[in-house]
Amino acid sequence: VDKFVIQGPTPLNGTIPISGSKNAALPLMAAALLGDGPTTITNVPKLKDIYTFNNVIRVTGAQVDFDESDEELTINPDNIGHLEAPYDLVRKMRASFYMLGALVGKYGKAKVSLPGGCAWGPRPVDLHLGGMRAMGIDISLEEGYVYAQAPDAIGKASFTLEPSSVGATINLVLASVLQADKFVLHNAAKEPDVVLLCETLAEMGADIDGIGTNTLTIRGVDSLNSITVRNAPDRIETGTFMIAAAMHPDSEITLTGTDPSELGVFPEYFNKTGAACTIDGTDIHIKAPDEIRPVSIDTGVYPGFPTDLQAQWCTMMTQAAGESTVTDTIYDDRFSYVPELVRLGADIAVEQNSACVNGPVPLSSASVMSTDLRASVSLVLAAMVAKGTTDVLRIYHLDRGYEDLEQKLSSVGAHIERVDQNEDG
């Protein structure tokens, strides 16, 4: 088990290339199972979750080839014969549950384990299953598995997502594009990952109206073609590095190969901190402010403030001159990182789904432990401005979602080293 050893404080200067998005790639991989013949996805990051999903897909009999040097992933579903996603793989990552929509969507039946994934908060799959039942798909739960069986013909159906859910939207789109006569999904998520999935399926031959809106109307087609599609850049990685650049007054970095249009309201909030942010096509240039201004945020569905940048923002606010509040309206239980920041010297009080942050406080080194993917990166950000040497333990969470994190940060001046945790835990 590895840990990061980070020496701070250090300014960041230079250029960081943004990787492809894990959250956008996983639905595209599931969509590839719906086509006839091999579909190729480019700009795919080399991440643990991608490898896990490759293995989930291989269990079905599909052929998966990942050319890591070119970041190209080719999936050929033509030899699928095993309509199951087993517990030992699905438990590692909740997005494996997209196999339910993909398999029942193309083959009319599936057996998929209930998912695992990040440790925080309840993540019910009731919305996914409720939408499928609304389509007339027979759903049963036995011994930790979901069994799905589609009828010979799915007629007209509609379903309203309450609340809106990215995962459920993706699964229901996958399930309906080949099966449904007409399926209307109300209060659908319109995150960039959902839009890219729908646009990709449309290019494969699916009939989807309302892409990019909260109402999707899907008319089933007989078959889908295979295509080559480029995966989106990672907007959460983009936001994370923007925050990292703002936290040390001498930092100035350029992020390349991103898509600023997919960041929603985030740049607007970011500029309020006093940081200088210049957008030039697919590049973003950030210059840190001399003093960070406190800016309170409430997370929201896209284009609102992303819940996946909440922990990083809270960390930046420990260095802001004044009081701010970070409220997560998406998940109740996403502040498990706060006690670790407090160990570094942060002044943060959590009440229900809000954190009240007082700054600026000088952070100093300690050993801290990651609890989930975004929490772990917030501890890395804190360690880079903390005085002394900080150990960040359990960084396997980071390997699920950040490609080459220590190499990218080292290349712009961070003192960060991956070492074997050994007896440290």
Residues covered by each model-derived region:
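Short, structured segments at the rim of ligand-binding sites
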Residues: 1-425
